[in-house]
Amino acid sequence: MDPIILAEINGNIATVGYGLAAIGPGIGVGIVAGKTVEAMARQPEMAGSLRTTMFLGIAFSEALALIGLATYFIFTN
C-alpha cells in the first residue's frame, strides 16, 4: 500500500484508541462522584473526609486518561 495511506490509517487508529481509553476514566469519575454524593447524604458529618477521598479517586482515574493521551502521541509519530 501507499505509505501516505498507511500513515493516515495509523493516525486514525491512534485516535480511536485514545477515545476508547478516555471512556473508562469518564465512567469511573461518574461512579466516584455519584457514590460520594450518596455517602454524604447518609453521613453529612463525614462530608469533608469524603470530598478529599473523592478528589483523590478522580485524580487517579484521570491519570489513566493522561496515559492514554501520551500513548496517542507516541503512536501518531
UniProtKB/Swiss-Prot annotation:
Annotated site residues (Reversibly protonated during proton transport) in this chain: E62
Q: Where in the cell is it found?
A: Cell membrane
Q: Which keywords describe this protein according to UniProt?
A: ATP synthesis, Cell membrane, CF(0), Hydrogen ion transport, Ion transport, Lipid-binding, Membrane, Transmembrane, Transmembrane helix, Transport
May I have one GO cellular component term?
Answer: plasma membrane
The portions of this protein that span the membrane are 13-33, 55-75
Task: Tell me the function of this protein.
Answer: F(1)F(0) ATP synthase produces ATP from ADP in the presence of a proton or sodium gradient. F-type ATPases consist of two structural domains, F(1) containing the extramembraneous catalytic core and F(0) containing the membrane proton channel, linked together by a central stalk and a peripheral stalk. During catalysis, ATP synthesis in the catalytic domain of F(1) is coupled via a rotary mechanism of the central stalk subunits to proton translocation.
Subunit structure as annotated in this protein's UniProt entry: F-type ATPases have 2 components, F(1) - the catalytic core - and F(0) - the membrane proton channel. F(1) has five subunits: alpha(3), beta(3), gamma(1), delta(1), epsilon(1). F(0) has three main subunits: a(1), b(2) and c(10-14). The alpha and beta chains form an alternating ring which encloses part of the gamma chain. F(1) is attached to F(0) by a central stalk formed by the gamma and epsilon chains, while a peripheral stalk is formed by the delta and b chains.
What name goes with this protein? ATP synthase subunit c
Q: Which organism is it from?
A: Clavibacter michiganensis subsp. michiganensis (strain NCPPB 382)
